[in-house]
Amino acid sequence: MPVEENYQPLLQEEEERAYDSDEKVLIIGVDSDTESGGSTVLPPFSWKKLWLFTGPGFLMSIAFLDPGNLEGDLQAGAIAGYSLLWLLLWATAMGLLVQLLSARLGVATGRHLAELCREEYPTWASMVLWIMAELALIGADIQEVIGSAIAIKILSNGFVPLWAGVTITACDCFIFLFLENYGVRKLEAVFAVLIGIMAVTFGWMFADAKPSASELFLGILIPKLSSRTIQQAVGVVGCIIMPHNVFLHSALVQSREIDHNKKDRVQEALRYYSIESTTALVISFVINLFVTTVFAKGFYGTELANSIGLVNAGQYLQDKYGGGFFPILYIWGIGLLAAGQSSTITGTYAGQFIMGGFLNLRLKKWLRALITRSCAIIPTMIVALVFDTSEDSLDVLNEWLNVLQSIQIPFALIPLLCLVSKEQIMGTFKIGPILKMVAWLVAALVMVINGYLLLDFFFNEVTGVAFTTVVCGFTGAYVAFIIYLISRGFTCFSRCCPSKQIEVE
């Protein structure tokens, strides 16, 4: 039987890569008449080039605005008032540092974190890292899809139940696939619109609430932390660094066509990615600040503060601030829907890179996206059916999901910091001793904070001899694997990467 000309095999013959060459945004050639492509001198700044590089940072910033972060914001505002705004600022700065290192890894090597983990670690360790990354992604995806489903329920006046909202949200996978066929810039434009919707809706709420400007600035400038607000402080930091986002950003930066063998081109890409990532996270900080201050103004010091959560936040806002020209309940619902939809799509995107990178799956992208979406949507549907009528149970589940993601953070941060520190991997773009020390201090701080969250949670939730034994056994294996990853980081990676030096023609 003759093979049809339009037939597309499910398996690709070449090795898995983040983007095919025909999918990348062309950078080489812009202002080429004024640049000496092989020079070691950094080309002059160009607004046109900044525009061409703009996109990956905004996709990355979605993880700072997902429903899990919004819940952390509203609880911090309701319970701690304005006092944790300084921590939100510094947590965002720490998140920016981690994401810039992730981008640096992707630009300098031409490969993303999942690929490098597969190549540089033994097979067994690589598989453990993959499983941990997938678990973190599934946990994040459940929160994101449930957040969208809650928003749909709000906007439909309760007519659409959670399970139906989950089904509707699951269809965004196919919208994402459709958009990607028209180019990565179209997809990035959609995310820009969704971020704009969040900025407008939460900014509208901020304007309606009229929070105290003096208390706001004092909260940002003066560090303050009491024993009563430690849990909210841990939540603020814990929500900022998402394991799957570290993998995602190192892949997103490869959507631009640059010559990785020319030092000036790599330096130029790093400069523009640093500018656009910083801009994106400044915007995300402002949006998170809007949410925190609205709930600080409305609920701090009230009896409702300890009971507020993502499920009932809209109704509490409506009761506090009233209807007005456009009811604040629906403004909140629209912003929450934009947050849930955008983060769900980026979760699907991250799932493709994680699965493809660790397993070297040479599948067509639509099939890989379908597989990753199915892995996440099935447990989410079960959650929606079980917890549809129980708000308290849904909040407890959310705590467990936060714990699940906190457990995974070292398995993204440690490989990243080890890889960007090695000349065998990064060549001349390895991080220097000062940046290395700062990065490890940030990573240690994040892991200690999340460790506190885990200990506090397990002391309160783990009961019974059998359950305690299982948790202790898991903890021992967990700590041992972290020690292995750190110790390996002080040895040379040499399985697949001989000493790499950037050549300048």
UniProtKB/Swiss-Prot annotation:
Organism of provenance: Populus trichocarpa
Q: Name one GO molecular function term.
A: manganese ion transmembrane transporter activity
This molecule's function is given as:
Divalent metal transporter. Can transport manganese (Mn) and iron (Fe). Involved in the release of metals stored in the vacuole.
Its protein name is: Metal transporter Nramp3.2
- Family according to the record: Belongs to the NRAMP (TC 2.A.55) family.
Q: In which tissues is it expressed?
A: Expressed in roots, stems, buds and leaves.
Coiled-coil annotation reads none
Subcellular localization = Vacuole membrane
Q: Which keywords fit this entry according to its UniProt record?
A: Ion transport, Membrane, Transmembrane, Transmembrane helix, Transport, Vacuole
Topology in the membrane? Multi-pass membrane protein
- What does the entry list under GO cellular component? plant-type vacuole membrane; vacuolar membrane
Q: Which domain of life is it from?
A: Eukaryota
What Gene Ontology terms for biological process does this UniProt record contain?
A: defense response to bacterium; intracellular iron ion homeostasis; iron ion transmembrane transport; iron ion transport; manganese ion transmembrane transport; manganese ion transport; positive regulation of reactive oxygen species metabolic process; regulation of vacuolar transport
TM ranges: 50-70, 78-98, 127-147, 159-179, 187-207, 233-253, 280-300, 321-341, 369-389, 400-420, 439-459, 466-486
Give the gene that encodes this protein: NRAMP3.2
Q: Which reaction does it catalyse?
A: Mn(2+)(in) = Mn(2+)(out); Fe(2+)(in) = Fe(2+)(out)
